[in-house]
């Protein structure tokens, strides 16, 4: 009996040829929480099946850690059932009996740390994803099916190496894309259509997102494919990418998406036509490209304590529709700058407030880009989230800086 667990809710006109379609977003479905990811739909189906068969559904609890990873990495709302799944999965993840998952946590030194949703979304998830992006998803699948600890360790290390390669490829792609982006922006393009012929198609969307974040312009990154060129786009508030693509659909051989992201394929000869038409139709104005940052409270770093950070952790897990609180401090003195990381993209600032409080601030950004912004300035105004940094058994207060600009004395 074929099943289809279509959680995306996109199939509105034609149902797939299955005896059962499990989709909580169907109009006729009265399931109370329709925002599950695919793994969540499958998990709740298994629970219902166990209950119907009068089996002990506690046997499914071992899967909660995997479900937490899927829920965070699928970027669904962390509300309702999703929030419970992630919270329970995080609570159990260090006790997992899955040899492959344990190996993946160990290779990132996570077993000795408190694991939160950030680790799932930005450390564990990308490693799993890198397998499918650069090779085959089979490697990640085999890791979680592995019963031999040594083989699991080896596969986990291979996945980490693949993800490190993906990071390097992404950084190189971003640098190349930025060069083009600045050029087209200077010419007056509002929508940045960037062509990177050597870019691996699986990271085009990541690069487009980075360009969008950096310049706050809608951005497409296209690369060579077997037939023509293909790529992905990422948008900003106020610009529905899919609707705008519909207006120039004649240039594509295939396209799809939603307001904030899209994918497309086209003949290489149509590239310039696409760039020209998408910009001619664009009604965005200069004010639309100004980055808007909403903070929760203007709070000097002098108020940060270990106890405050522990209290904030009650709000975890953070993610879509349950974002971390964002704080701000105006005018911190930058006493020292240190740069770390293989790609020189981890910036550590020694900061001092006007009241004399000293604290480290972390910025994850290319060194050249950071130093260009800083110039000779000595003071920084920033938004941040406070964390506890653990290193060799020593704990210290630290802020992770989200947005910033430099100010004069």
Predicted regions: what is each one?
Residues 1-7, 200, 258, 346:
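Histidine-centered active-site/metal-ligand motif
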Residues 1-76, 245:
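Conserved phosphate-handling catalytic cores of large alpha/beta enzymes
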Residues 2, 21-23, 68, 221, ...:
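Structural signal for conserved beta-strand scaffold positions within catalytic alpha/beta enzyme cores
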Residues 15-17, 214, 356:
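Short, well-ordered coil/turn elements that cap or connect secondary structure elements
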Residues 19-21, 33-34, 40, 189-193, ...:
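Structural motif
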Residues 40, 205, 209, 382:
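Short alpha-helical basic/polar micro-motif
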Residues 51-276, 298, 340-341:
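Hydrophobic helix-and-loop "lid/oligomerization" segment in the mid-to-C-terminal part
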Residues 80, 151-155, 161-195, 247-409:
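Mid-to-C-terminal polyanion-binding domains and interfaces
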């Amino acid at each position: 009996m074929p099943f289809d667990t279509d959680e995306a809710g996109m199939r509105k006109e034609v149902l797939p040829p299955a005896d059962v379609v499990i989709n909580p977003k169907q109009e006729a479905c009265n399931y109370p929480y329709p925002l599950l990811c695919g793994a969540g739909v499958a998990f709740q189906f298994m629970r219902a099946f166990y209950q119907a068969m009068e089996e002990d559904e506690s046997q499914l609890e071992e899967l909660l850690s995997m479900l937490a990873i899927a829920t965070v990495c699928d970027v669904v709302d962390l509300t309702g059932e999703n929030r419970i799944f992630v919270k329970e999965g995080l609570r159990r993840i260090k006790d997992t009996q899955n040899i492959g998952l344990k190996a993946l946590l160990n290779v990132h030194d996570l077993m000795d740390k408190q694991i939160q949703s950030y680790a799932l979304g930005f450390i564990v998830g990308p490693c799993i994803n890198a397998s499918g992006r650069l090779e085959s998803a089979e490697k990640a699948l085999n890791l979680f099916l592995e019963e031999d600890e040594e083989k699991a360790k080896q596969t986990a290390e291979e996945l980490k190496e693949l993800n490190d390669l993906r990071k390097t490829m992404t950084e190189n792609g971003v640098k190349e894309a930025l060069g083009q982006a600045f050029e087209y922006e200077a010419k007056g393009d509002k929508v940045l259509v960037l062509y990177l012929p050597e870019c691996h198609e699986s990271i085009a969307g990541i690069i487009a997102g980075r360009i969008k974040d950096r310049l706050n312009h809608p951005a497409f990154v296209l690369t060579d494919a077997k037939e023509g060129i293909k790529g992905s786009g990422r948008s900003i508030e106020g610009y529905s990418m899919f609707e705008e693509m519909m207006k120039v659909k004649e240039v594509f051989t295939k396209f799809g998406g939603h307001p904030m992201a899209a994918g497309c394929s086209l003949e290489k000869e149509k590239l310039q036509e696409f760039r020209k038409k998408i910009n001619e139709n664009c009604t965005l104005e200069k004010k639309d490209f100004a980055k808007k940052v909403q903070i929760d409270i203007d709070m000097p770093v002098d108020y940060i304590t270990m106890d405050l950070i522990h209290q904030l952790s009650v709000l975890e897990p953070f993610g879509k529709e349950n974002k971390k609180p964002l704080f701000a401090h105006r005018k911190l003195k930058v006493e020292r700058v240190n740069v770390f990381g293989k790609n020189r993209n981890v910036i550590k600032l020694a900061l001092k407030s006007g009241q004399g409080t000293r604290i480290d601030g972390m910025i994850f950004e290319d060194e050249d880009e950071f130093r260009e912004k800083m110039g000779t300035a000595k003071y920084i105004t920033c938004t941040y989230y406070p964390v506890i940094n653990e290193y060799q058994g020593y704990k210290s207060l630290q802020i992770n800086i989200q947005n910033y600009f430099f100010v004069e004395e």
